[in-house]
Amino acid sequence: MELKAMYLYAAVLAVLLCSSVNFIQSPTDVLGPVALLEPTPSSARDFGAVVSDAPFAVMRPESPDDIALLLGALSSTAPSPRATVAAVGAGHSLHGQAQARDGIVVETRALPRDVHVVSARAHGGDDDATVRAYADVGAGALWVEVLEECLKLGLAPPSWTDYLYLTVGGTLSNGGISGQTFKHGPQISNVLQLEVVTGKGEVVTCSPTEIPELFFAVLGGLGQFGIITRARIPLQLAPPKVRWVRAFYDSFETFTGDQELLVSMPEQVDYVEGFMVLNEQSLHSSSVAFPAQLNFSPDFGSKGRKKVYYCIEFAVHDFQQDSSRADHVVKLVSAKLSYLRPHVYSVEVSYFDFLNRVRMEEESLRSRGLWDVPHPWLNVFVPKHGITQFKGLLMDTVSADDFEGPILVYPLLTDKWDGNTSAVVPAAPDGVMYIFGVLRSTDPARCGRACVDSIMARHRRVADEACRDGGGGGRGIGAKQYLARQPSPARWRDHFGAGWGRFAARKARFDPLHVLGPGQGIFPRTDSAGSM
């Protein structure tokens, strides 16, 4: 290990002492057993495809110890401002958050991706014992890999993201939300233990009771305090199948009212989401994964006025062979909803296919050349009182004629979010907030760089207006952005609000030289602890 550390130390010094502009020697020539590799074009690319900051080198660690050696060397050599490190998983950041200009990118997919399931049922056999089941997971594992392994024992994590081809460490560094969040909370509220390499190069095991400050800091911490290398995730019984329901609306108020009714029934309903239907294309693309015939032919504006429709989707887990209970629940729940009669549709699918539904949408977009394209997305948490105002702001910037992609709208309950984590949600006096997710794909043939920049500028104006505090008679809504990169450190302080002091104190404790997470743009690199 000492020899390995010496090789890495020399490599790090080469990074520190040489400019990315005039550096001639390849990093692979000076390394030894811990390799820093030449960057490739993919090292400066992410799913958003709107920011491209090339690193100096790439690390593919074999173990957390490799990362610890790297960060330990960087934190002990009074490095230059360029010596930063970003962790990247599946590369699904939207605004370059997992990039490190002239720094080092650590590819966590190179770490062991094992999924080890421990089930208390093997010792007890009663259903209550499954609450104590968990999976120890390498942070570079994809959630779909976790699902596949857990289902072998009839188990699954309770909380998900819509898209499963994301890494465990990546979503836990942000939040992790989907239609189960109203019931179980986000993924960051469903973690028992973490292994983390801090910005000082320390490998630490932490939990709500063991070094809790680090545990809660890294959950939703945007990669600022440490790199998650393992996670222990609680498991529950997985249903063999799911009854999946969609209902259509032509009134935003009725649509959101019914969503709030659904999330008030967690004993009956297991998943609630919804989306706006702007045009024929959005109706078609949102139906790709839904394996039922939709006899819904809305009028989007043939009478001269644009009309927007809405769709609620909810799901009921089905543990019975004959599906009678799930069908009964769906019938009772649907009877309470005020959808456009008769436009409610129900289908039975396997639990795996339901959770993996976005994969079909991905394949459809790939076939049309609309997956590896710029994605100028906008995700905003909006308190319930501001959703109508926010929808108005949003629709002023969206053209229904050519919009490509879903606009998600569904409620979340703020009491399901642990306030000890680093995640930021808006103040919602009634405990209800909505996620608005504008998940746009841009066709390069019709929308070049100037067009993408224009979309992002419009999104910034919407976010600025919505995130202003509405107190004192102001027009602001008090919303909070999600998965976004703020334009300056000052704007990050505004984003965190009263939580900024705690966030900054955690940074000073676990990454005092500001080595980690440069792509977020929160903390400029410093040469000494405590300076900015």
Swiss-Prot record:
Alphabetical UniProt keywords: FAD, Flavoprotein, Glycoprotein, Oxidoreductase, Secreted, Signal
Needed co-factor(s): FAD
MF GO annotations: cytokinin dehydrogenase activity; FAD binding; oxidoreductase activity
Biological process according to GO: cytokinin metabolic process
Record's subcellular location: Secreted, Extracellular space
PANTHER family named among the record's database cross-references: CYTOKININ DEHYDROGENASE 8, GULONOLACTONE OXIDASE
Entry protein name: Cytokinin dehydrogenase 8
Protein source organism: Oryza sativa subsp. japonica
